[in-house]
Amino acid sequence: MYNFSAGPACLPEEVLIRARDEMLDWHGSGMSVMEMPFTSDEYRQIESHASRTLRNLVDLPDNYHILFLQGGAYAHFAILAMNLGGNHGAADYVQTGHWSTRAINEAGKIIRVNIAAGSEDSGFDHIPAYSEWNLDPEAAYCHITTNETASGLQYHWLPDTGAVPL
């Protein structure tokens, strides 16, 4: 069975067996990865390998850093507002469903949110046409949820927000 949903998916049995076998003793270290101090040589090797692999996979230039962060979507919504909000008065958000609403609610704890466009009144059944958006040219940033997995909406284009970061 193949699962292409946004949540957890099935893994090949070989992967599950390897994970099981290495759960209690990572490569002879005597401990699980979950028990390792993030400052240990073993953990740093794992992180370095993961970073190199990801960098090669997406062809990421060396002038970009890779951060491995915990917290899930809600934490990232807050991190975005905290880091890009700066001294700006507001950020633009386009509300198209479950995840954009969660992003708006989380960012609203940190920065004033301008809902530049949305489709809540029609049950989140479409992405508003760009001509309907009310963008603030002074906004700290503009946030869109490119793939609303809960409602099945997906952008097939990216808006031109001018000098405002998207």
Where are the language model's segments positioned?
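Conserved PLP-anchoring active-site segment centered on the Schiff-base-forming lysine
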Residues: 85-101
